[in-house]
Amino acid sequence: MPETMDISPRNNHRVTFISALLVVLFLLLFAVDRGLFNHLIDTSYVWSAQHFGWFWQIFMLANFGVAMFALTRRGAGRKLGQRSEPEFPAFQWVAMVLCTLLAGGGVFWAAAEPIAHLVSPPPVFPEAAPLSNQAIDQALAQSFLHWGFLAWSVLGSLAAIILMHLHYERGLPLAPRSLLYPLTGEGGVKGWMGDLADIVSALAVFAGTVGPIGFLGLQISYGLSEFIGTRDHLPMQLGTIACLMAVYLTSAVSGMHKGIQILSRLNIVLGLLVLAFLFLAGPTQFILEHFGGALLTHLAWLPQQALFRGDEAWLSAWTVFFWGWFIGYGPMMAIFIARISRGRSAREIILLMSVVAPLLTMAWFSIIGGTGLGLEAANPGTITAPFEGFNLPAVLLAITGALPFNTVVTLAFLVLTALFVATTGDSMTYSLSVVSSGTDHPPRWLRLFWGLTMGVTAMVLISGSAGGIGKLQSFIVVTAVPVSLLLVPSLWGVFKAIKPPSD
């Protein structure tokens, strides 16, 4: 019999109340004193990047290294979650995992980031002239760092395995507080430290989800306005976010086996169709050549890329920002992965999260971003002219506009972006509700509460000023400071979690 512990899940009204209160105070400050709001966010962002950026870089590399080592351990083949067979078939499992993270980068960043690095090459590499052939592989390789092995590994390998062990085999809550157990034992999980862990994790993923809802909602609105030839004004932006909110709320309320699963499958199918078209209609040979070259560059330079500290201003705008974003997502994403991975082994989870998903994401970036790079190489100015002034939203439309059947392709990308955002919205609504309710099956009213709160927050920030969503994305990095400390015990706790019971 597995060892159990008397820490029963409960309705954690205190965590819900404090988290919601802090969100309200955040919005009140935004509404009352915009100057003070901006100053506090900017100052906190700079402080977090300066004092924790180096730590995050080391932690991200260490987390991936420990995951690769844990993969080889004898206990890694043991089924987790108190099930002998997986709850979800392989395709559905992979679809839900991929769609939840790719919301932020699946379309927008895959198109824009490689071009940004082509125009302004990353300082970690030996000097390459902007827009040169050498800069192409380096641009993709830098994108691979930000969306590849290290990013995926922190989102659900070690932490998810620990939560599955502690929740399903030891009786601890399926909540961020349980990640404290390898360090503090029962006392830290049950006391104020546990409440604090849940609150900061809730705020981090709240900011990390509202950011993409608002930011990508603006990109969809911009794309629609260009598509139909009208002005991109506030009512269109708010209407776009309201539609996104309606989709992910419907999905989240319908449950894990219905809405979330169906939306993820639809997302994957449409994504594969779009990728196939881009690969065949775009610069196919260019994509294949530079995917291979960029992957080899990334593997050869991975330690240098991960630990580069030569340009702190560049790091805070790119690598440290992404690391803060993904670390902030870590505990809540781990809850989601733990819930959908019952009946899977630690080895399966690590392989998917730390190897397979990163490679699929790199291929995704190579096809979407590589198409833009190839179009630019063949006809200089095709992509960089619309991108001038760091106009990131214009890159995707420039790519689709240069392809055959551009009207259909543009519309498909806008729908795909909406589906990605909705998939992350429903998944994180579910995770927040799990923490708030203390049960794997949170009530519908609680899912509605968190889903509505995220959507309304995005609308308020957009209505208030052009930079509101941008400030929220900076706040993501601030919340990652305490969350990163919460994830550290996973580096050694995973070995206890995968240890066979007989040992």
Label each PLM-derived region with a short phrase.
Residues 2-135, 276, 490-501:
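N-terminal alpha-helical transmembrane segments of multi-pass membrane transport
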Residues 2-7, 39-45, 72-90, 115-140, ...:
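Flexible loop linkers connecting adjacent transmembrane helices
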Residues 11-18, 76-95, 285, 289, ...:
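C-terminal membrane-solvent junction of multi-pass transporters and transport-like membrane proteins
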Residues 14-21, 47-63, 94, 136-168, ...:
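Extracellular loop-to-transmembrane helix junctions
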Residues 22, 55-73, 271-282, 360-370, ...:
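Hydrophobic alpha-helical segments of multi-pass membrane transport proteins
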Residues 188-196, 200-344, 351, 356-410:
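Membrane-embedded translocation segments of transport machinery
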